[in-house]
C-alpha cells in the first residue's frame, strides 16, 4: 500500500475550531504513524470572509498543538500552490476537460430564473433540483455561464467508509451541481476533488457533515479519470445539550484554550479521545498516539465535549511536570496578567503548591495572584477573621515570625502549635486569621508554604496591614 498522503483543508474565515483541530490531529497521526505526508491546504475561495488574520490563527493553532505539516503555504512542496485562490487556472483546465468529454456543461440560466424555480419548488413543498435546462445546449463561452457537472440519472454510488462502513447514495437525490462559477472560482466539491487529485491525496479524513458530498465527489474523480481516495468520516463533536458544538457551549477555539492556560499535550490528548479509544487508557504521550492511532478504532457516534473532563486531563498532565518545567511554562501567564513573576525559586514554589489545587495556568494566576500582588481582602473573611478577638493571635504570630532567622517548616510549625496550645485553641483557629491577613481569603495552600513563598519581610508587612485594619 502506498504511504498515506493526507490533508487538512480549513477555510480561513475564523479561528481554528476544536472540531477542525481534531480533524487535523487524526490526519497528522495517520501520516506520522505510517511514514506519510501531511498537507496543509487553505480553502480561501470565500473572498469576502477569508482573512490573513484567520490564516495566521490556523498556523498558530496547529503549531501550538505540535501538528507540523510537510507541505503547505509557508513550507512549499511539489504540489503547490496551497491556497485555492492561487489555483484558479488548474480548476479551469480540469473543468474544460470535463466539458470536452461531455461530463460537464455550461449553464446559462440566470439567477432570476433559478430563484423562481426554487420558489415554485418551495410552494409545492418539494426539494429543488436543477431541472437540466441547459444539459444538451452547445457550449458558447461568449455567453455568461457557470459550469455544471453531469450526474448520471439512474443508479447509485456506494463507497466503504473507514469509520462508517458501506454507504450508498442513489443518483436521484443528486443534481447537476455547479462546479465552476462565472468568475472562475470553484464550488467546494469540485475544488476539493481537483486539489486532492493534483496533490496526490489518497485518504480523506474529515467531519461526517461531509458524508453527503462524498458520492458527488467520487463521481467527479471518476469523470476526471482518477481513482477516488479512501474516506474516513469522523463523528461530530457535540455540546452538553447534544447539539453541534458552538460558541454558546463556551470556548470552541484552540487559541482560547491556549490563552486559558491549557497544555497543548492535554488538548491533543483530550481531542483524540473524542471519538477514538485504545482500551481503557486515558492519558497518552505523543509517541503513544502515533504508535496506537488507527481509523479502525474511531467510533461512529458523536463525541460530547466536556470542559470539566478536559480540565481534568489538563490537570493530570500538569501533575506530570517537574516544578522547574511547571514554572517555566506558567511564567508567561503570570506576566500576561501584569504580575512581577520571574523564573525563580519563588515561582517554582508557587507552582509546587498549585500543582494539586489548580487545573490550568489560568487558574494558577487566578488563585495565587496574591503571591505577587497586594492582598485583596474578601469582605466576609475580613469581617469574620480580622477582629479584636483575633488581634492577639496576629500580634503573637507576627512577633514569632520576626524573631525567626529563617522561615523553616519546623520552626513555623512549632510557632503555630505553641500559640494554639497556649490559647487552648485548635490549630485552625490560629491559622485562619493569619491566612486571611496574608492571602485575603479563607482558602490557600498550607500556611507554612504561604509564609515561605511570601518571605519574611512581605509576611510581616501584610500582618502589619491586617493589624492596622483591625485598628
Swiss-Prot record:
A motif ('KMSKS' region) lies at residues 244-248. Its EC number is 6.1.1.17. The keyword Ligase applies. GO terms for biological process: glutamyl-tRNA aminoacylation. It is found in: Cytoplasm. It catalyses: tRNA(Glu) + L-glutamate + ATP = L-glutamyl-tRNA(Glu) + AMP + diphosphate. The keyword Ribonucleoprotein does not apply. It comes from the Bacteria. Binds 1 zinc ion per subunit. Keywords: Aminoacyl-tRNA synthetase, ATP-binding, Cytoplasm, Ligase, Metal-binding, Nucleotide-binding, Protein biosynthesis, Zinc. GO terms for molecular function: ATP binding; glutamate-tRNA ligase activity; tRNA binding; zinc ion binding. A motif ('HIGH' region) lies at residues 10-20. Zn(2+) binds at residues 107, 109, 134, 136. It is an enzyme of class 6 (ligase). PROSITE patterns: AA_TRNA_LIGASE_I. One of its GO terms (cellular component) is cytosol. Its cofactor is Zn(2+). Catalyzes the attachment of glutamate to tRNA(Glu) in a two-step reaction: glutamate is first activated by ATP to form Glu-AMP and then transferred to the acceptor end of tRNA(Glu). Monomer. Belongs to the class-I aminoacyl-tRNA synthetase family. Glutamate--tRNA ligase type 1 subfamily. This is Glutamate--tRNA ligase. It comes from Anaeromyxobacter sp. (strain Fw109-5). The gene is gltX.
Amino acid at each position: 500500500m502506498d504511504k498515506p498522503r493526507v490533508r487538512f483543508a480549513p477555510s480561513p474565515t475564523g479561528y481554528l475550531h476544536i472540531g477542525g483541530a481534531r480533524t487535523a490531529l487524526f490526519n497528522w497521526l495517520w501520516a506520522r504513524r505510517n511514514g506519510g505526508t501531511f498537507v496543509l491546504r487553505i480553502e480561501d475561495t470565500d473572498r469576502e470572509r477569508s482573512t490573513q488574520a484567520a490564516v495566521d490563527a490556523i498556523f498558530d493553532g496547529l503549531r501550538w498543538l505540535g501538528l507540523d505539516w510537510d507541505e503547505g503555504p509557508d513550507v512549499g512542496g511539489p504540489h503547490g500552490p496551497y491556497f485555492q485562490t492561487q489555483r484558479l487556472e488548474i480548476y479551469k483546465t480540469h473543468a474544460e476537460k470535463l466539458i470536452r468529454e461531455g461530463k460537464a456543461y455550461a449553464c446559462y440560466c440566470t439567477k432570476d430564473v433559478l430563484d423562481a424555480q426554487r420558489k415554485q419548488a418551495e410552494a409545492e413543498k418539494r426539494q429543488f433540483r436543477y431541472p437540466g435546462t441547459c444539459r444538451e445546449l452547445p457550449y458558447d463561452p461568449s455567453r455568461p455561464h457557470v459550469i455544471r457537472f453531469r450526474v448520471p440519472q439512474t443508479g447509485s454510488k456506494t463507497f466503504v467508509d473507514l469509520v462508517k462502513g458501506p454507504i450508498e447514495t442513489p443518483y436521484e437525490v443528486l443534481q447537476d451541481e455547479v462546479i465552476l462559477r462565472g468568475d472562475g472560482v470553484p464550488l467546494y466539491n469540485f475544488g476539493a476533488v481537483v486539489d486532492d487529485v493534483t496533490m496526490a491525496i489518497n485518504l480523506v479524513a474529515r467531519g461526517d457533515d461531509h458524508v453527503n458530498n462524498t458520492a458527488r465527489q467520487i463521481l467527479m474523480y471518476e469523470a476526471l479519470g482518477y481513482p477516488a481516495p479512501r474516506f474516513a468520516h469522523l463523528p461530530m463533536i457535540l455540546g452538553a445539550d447534544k447539539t453541534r458544538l458552538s460558541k454558546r457551549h463556551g470556548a470552541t477555539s484552540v487559541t482560547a484554550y491556549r490563552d486559558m492556560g491549557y497544555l497543548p499535550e492535554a488538548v491533543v490528548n483530550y481531542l483524540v479521545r473524542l471519538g477514538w479509544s485504545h482500551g481503557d487508557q486515558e492519558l497518552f504521550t505523543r509517541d503513544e498516539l502515533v504508535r496506537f492511532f488507527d481509523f479502525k478504532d474511531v467510533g461512529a457516534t458523536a463525541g460530547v465535549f466536556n470542559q470539566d473532563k478536559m480540565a481534568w486531563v489538563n490537570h493530570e498532565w500538569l501533575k506530570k511536570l517537574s516544578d522547574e518545567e511547571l514554572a517555566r511554562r506558567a511564567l508567561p501567564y503570570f506576566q500576561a496578567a501584569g504580575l512581577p513573576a520571574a523564573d525563580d525559586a519563588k515561582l517554582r514554589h508557587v507552582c509546587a503548591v498549585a500543582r494539586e489545587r489548580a487545573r490550568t495556568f489560568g487558574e494558577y494566576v487566578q488563585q495565587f495572584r496574591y503571591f505577587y500582588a497586594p492582598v485583596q481582602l474578601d469582605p466576609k473573611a475580613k469581617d469574620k477573621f480580622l477582629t479584636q478577638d483575633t488581634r492577639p493571635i496576629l500580634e503573637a504570630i507576627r512577633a514569632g515570625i520576626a524573631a525567626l532567622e529563617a522561615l523553616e517548616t519546623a520552626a513555623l510549625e512549632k510557632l503555630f502549635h505553641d500559640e494554639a496550645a497556649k490559647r487552648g485553641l485548635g490549630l485552625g483557629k490560629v491559622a485562619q486569621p493569619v491566612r486571611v491577613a496574608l492571602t485575603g481569603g479563607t482558602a490557600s495552600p498550607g500556611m507554612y508554604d504561604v509564609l515561605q513563598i511570601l518571605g519574611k519581610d512581605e509576611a510581616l508587612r501584610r500582618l502589619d496591614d491586617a493589624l492596622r485594619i483591625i485598628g
